[in-house]
Regions:
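Aromatic- and glycine-enriched beta-alpha-beta binding-site module
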Residues: 169
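Surface-exposed acidic/polar loop and edge beta-strand patches at domain peripheries
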Residues: 1-152, 163-166, 175-185
C-alpha cells in the first residue's frame, strides 16, 4: 500500500456470507469488490457470477424467479445472473436431460479466496462424479485486479476417471438493465 490507505479493505475486499431469507436461504455467496467492479459469486452453484456491478451500476439480468437454493424445476429456478455455466452432460433440452444441464446446480468447493494488493482471486473446484462412472473435476479461477474494469474467469476440466468422457459446456451470459436498454449499442 502506498501510505494513503491503512487497510486494503478501503479499496478492495472479499466477503463470504450465507443468504438467510426466503427461497435464497442457504445460498453461499462470495461478495467481491475491486474498487471499480463488484461481483457476487454463487458458491452454492458452480461459482457462477450472480451479479456484476460496474462503478455501482448493475449490468446483469436477474429473472423474475430471483435466486433460489431449492431444487425445483428449471423454469421455476432459472435466475439468470451474469454467468450461468451449462453442462456437463447436456446444454440444451435433449430428451432425458435437464435444460442447460446440472453443472450450475453443483456446489463449489472454494480452495482459495483472497484479496491482495494485486487483486481479488478466487479458486474453486466443482466435482461431477458417479459411482462406477464419470469422475470430472471442473476447476474455476476468478481474478480481478484492484481498480480494473475486467473480470477474468479461467476454467479447466480434469478427467480423473479411467475412461475418456464426453462433455459439453456453454457459458450463458445474461446482460440486463440498465446496461441493456433502449438505444444500447
Amino acid at each position: 500500500m502506498d501510505g494513503r490507505i491503512s487497510n486494503l479493505m478501503q479499496v478492495a475486499s472479499v466477503r463470504r456470507y450465507e443468504m438467510t431469507e426466503g427461497k435464497e436461504r442457504g445460498l453461499r455467496v462470495l461478495d467481491c469488490d475491486n474498487g471499480k467492479l463488484r461481483f457476487l459469486l454463487n458458491e452454492s452453484k458452480a461459482l457462477d457470477v450472480m451479479q456484476l456491478y460496474h462503478e455501482g451500476q448493475n449490468v446483469s439480468f436477474i429473472s423474475k424467479n430471483g435466486f433460489t437454493a431449492r431444487e425445483i424445476p428449471f423454469a421455476n429456478r432459472f435466475e439468470g445472473g451474469m454467468l450461468y455455466t451449462c453442462g456437463l452432460e447436456s446444454v440444451g433440452a435433449s430428451e432425458g436431460y435437464e435444460l442447460h444441464g446440472t453443472h450450475h446446480n453443483a456446489p463449489a468447493r472454494v480452495m482459495r479466496a483472497e484479496c491482495t494488493k494485486e487483486g481479488v482471486s478466487i479458486e474453486a473446484e466443482i466435482a461431477e462424479s458417479e459411482l462406477f462412472g464419470r469422475n470430472l473435476i471442473f476447476k474455476r479461477r476468478v481474478f480481478s485486479a484492484v481498480g480494473s474494469d475486467s473480470l477474468e474467469i479461467s476454467d479447466t476440466l480434469e478427467n480423473r476417471g479411467a475412461c475418456d468422457e464426453r462433455y459439453c459446456l456453454l457459458y450463458h451470459v445474461n446482460v440486463g438493465y440498465p446496461l441493456l436498454d433502449e438505444g444500447a449499442k
